[in-house]
């Protein structure tokens, strides 16, 4: 199996850890230039640095609060990676299609597969794209409102699937 998702997860974990250590946003933004082919600068896969920082900070905080093992997050990211980055998606319906796939997977998966880490990985990618104005189907909201909503949703999801 391609090790790319595992490499990405390690980069994400390192990125979140630095953010929690109080580094400057410039330093954090520089870390967002992951040494990972997924983030290759193509418009479709572009990560906004500020958005990545906010997502990772909130996700990492929720994981620590809920005692989610990194193995669950890693397995979840691998699954989401296979769903999203196969290059066959209709970008006009990508958001709703992925939500349906995640719902179906959670309904049919085992307890281990549907752990909180899966929900975190899915929400990370879905919410990250909400800041990308080049993709259809997303509303723009303020950063403060976004962080508040993301933290609430992640916490609720963790309680449901852990």
Regions inferred by a protein language model and the residue ranges of each:
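N-terminal interaction modules that seed assembly of large macromolecular complexes
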Residues: 22-68
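Helix-driven interaction modules
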Residues: 83-162
């Amino acid at each position: 199996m391609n090790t790319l998702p595992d490499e990405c997860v390690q980069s994400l974990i390192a990125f979140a850890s630095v953010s929690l250590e109080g580094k400057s946003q410039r330093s954090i933004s520089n870390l967002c230039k992951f040494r990972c082919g997924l983030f290759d600068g193509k418009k479709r896969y572009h990560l906004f640095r500020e958005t990545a920082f906010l997502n990772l900070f909130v996700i990492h905080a929720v994981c620590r609060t809920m005692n989610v093992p990194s193995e669950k997050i890693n397995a979840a990211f691998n699954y989401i990676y296979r769903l999203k980055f196969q290059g066959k998606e209709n970008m006009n319906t990508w958001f709703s299609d992925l939500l349906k796939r995640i719902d179906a997977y959670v309904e049919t998966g085992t307890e281990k597969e549907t752990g909180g880490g899966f929900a975190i990985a899915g929400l990370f990618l879905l919410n990250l794209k909400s800041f990308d104005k080049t993709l259809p189907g997303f509303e723009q909201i303020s950063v403060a409102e976004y962080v508040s909503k993301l933290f609430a949703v992640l916490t609720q999801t963790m309680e449901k699937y852990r």
